[in-house]
Structures are given as structure tokens and as C-alpha cells.
Regions:
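Compact, glycine-rich, soluble single-domain proteins
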Residues: 22-152
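N-terminal signal peptide c-region/cleavage motif recognized by signal peptidases
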Residues: 16-18
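Bacterial N-terminal signal peptides that target proteins for export
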Residues: 1-7
Length: 152
């Protein structure tokens, strides 16, 4: 009995570590841990966060984002998700550097979700870059408790 409990705990820890550290590599770009927070209401805007690493010798730009489960996707300069006028045309990713897309900085905003997002769900998203082209990623939906408080 104790061995079975230990195996269950070990599997849960391994699953949690894997879920927290997933990444997608394509050419010179690595997309690290794309995630968002669960929602109870499909009408609520969703902020998607991730880190984009460019290991190449040339800069790139995130030009577009698409997801099949949403009516609209936007690249945002910052500010609250419900603010108007924060859309930007692209996010630069300089050579040999990384960009953190998250609340308080540039981020991805999804609106018009087809259904609420439950914790531990995931959904596909396509990121289109100027040089690297299209990169398919899987966005993990995390519990609300994963959201770090913003420093105002």
C-alpha cells in the first residue's frame, strides 16, 4: 500500500515538473512555457505569457498569433487586458536574447473564447515570426493561484 502511494506521489511530482517547464524549439527560437490562467467566463479576456529565446545571430519579430478557440488575438504593449489602444504590430526578439511576454510588459491577449478554460487544460496556438515562420505551441492553462501579483 505504501509503495503504491509513493508511486502516485512520484508520478504527480514528475507531471508537475514537466508541465511547468515545457518548451518548443524551432530553428534558432525556443518558446518556453506558454501558459495562461483558468477562466470561469468565456467572455473574459485571456493573457498568454511565455518566454521567447533567440539563440541565432539575427534578430526576429513575432508578427502574429492565432488560436482556434478564440475570436480575436492581439499582441499588446502592456497595460490591463481590458484597456483600449494597447495593440502593437509586432514584438522584436533581438539576436542572442530573450523576451518575456507577460502582464506588465508585452503580452498576447485572447478575446472571445469559445468556452471557459479549465485548470490543467491546454490548447494549440500558432506564433508567426518574420524569419522563423510559423511555430506551433501548446498553451497550458494554470490555476488562478499561479498568477503573480503585479507590482504597481
Amino acid at each position: 500500500m505504501a509503495l503504491k502511494s509513493l508511486a502516485i506521489v512520484a508520478a504527480a511530482i514528475l507531471w508537475a515538473a514537466t508541465a511547468q517547464a515545457h518548451s518548443h524549439k524551432f530553428k534558432t527560437l525556443e518558446i518556453v512555457h506558454p501558459w495562461c490562467i483558468e477562466t470561469e467566463d468565456a467572455a473574459k479576456p485571456v493573457v498568454v505569457s511565455m518566454t521567447i529565446r533567440n539563440t541565432g545571430s539575427k534578430p526576429d519579430r513575432l508578427l502574429r498569433v492565432s488560436a482556434p478557440n478564440t475570436a480575436k488575438t492581439e499582441l499588446r504593449a502592456g497595460g490591463p487586458p481590458d484597456a483600449e489602444g494597447n495593440a502593437i504590430a509586432s514584438v522584436p526578439v533581438e539576436r542572442k536574447s530573450e523576451v518575456n511576454l507577460k502582464r506588465g510588459g508585452p503580452y498576447i491577449l485572447l478575446t472571445g473564447m469559445k468556452k471557459p478554460l479549465g485548470a490543467y487544460d491546454s490548447f494549440p496556438m500558432t506564433l508567426t515570426f518574420e524569419r522563423a515562420g510559423k511555430i506551433e505551441v501548446e498553451v497550458t492553462v494554470e490555476e488562478t493561484s499561479a498568477l503573480e501579483p503585479l507590482k504597481q
